[in-house]
Structure formats: structure tokens, C-alpha cells
């Protein structure tokens, strides 16, 4: 069951630039029919990711990923850990983290200060290098990135020069 949109969400989510960003992201990442789920996940992230919840960040990220992938059977409080259990090879030939290391790497990343200390781009780069999920990693990273930056503008990928070419674990 998807969480209901927040009361504040109606005004924020009906803005044309929000839907344009969502449609651009899901199309860019090969899931053009999942814009509503992407919006739902972004609404959840922007209204539930707070510093007071920093010890729960990993669980929240898993929930956002399940939402962007259209999993309607989840609730925010109870669901299984669904990290990938296969190798991941990127289009540029680089590989994601060894799947057996994903729980440890995600735990370390989420306990680091990167997400909360204005180092969100570095957090997202590390998240994408780990590539913890079977599907929806890019959409999840976009939501995480824009959780911190959306009031200025929506961005698709971290702006650190060369990070895609250098993406290695």
C-alpha cells in the first residue's frame, strides 16, 4: 500500500516542474510508466528524511526504492531487505559492489555524515557505485539528491566532473 500524499504535497506535487522532472527521470532510466510512483517516493522522502531519523536512513532508502519500482505491497514500517544478489555491470564496463558486501556498504554509507552534511552528491555517487538494488538505483539516487536540492532546482545526476567515468568500488 502506497503512503498517502501529504497535505502539503498537493500544492508542491502539482507544480509543472515537479512532474516534468519526474517524467524526465523515469524516461531517462527506462521506466516511463512509473512517474506517479516516482512522485510518491519523492513526496515520502522530502517529508520523512530528517536528521532526527539518521539512524533509520538505510531503511528509508530501501522503502523509497520499493516505491519507485512500483511495489504497492510495502508499508513504511515492515518489509524485507531486498538488496540485489547478483553482479551488476554498468554500461561503461565498471561493476557495482560485490553483492555480498552490499549490506555492510549500505550500513556504512548511511551511518556516514555525507547525506546530512551537505555532501549529498558524494553520498549519491557512493550509493550508485554500490548499486544496491536490482532495479531503480538511478531513480532512488535522483530522489535522494533532490531531497536536499529541490528548492533551488531539480537535477538529474551529481554534478561532480568525471564521476561517471571514474565510478569504481
Where do the protein language model's features map onto the residues?
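FIC/Doc superfamily catalytic core
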Residues: 1-169
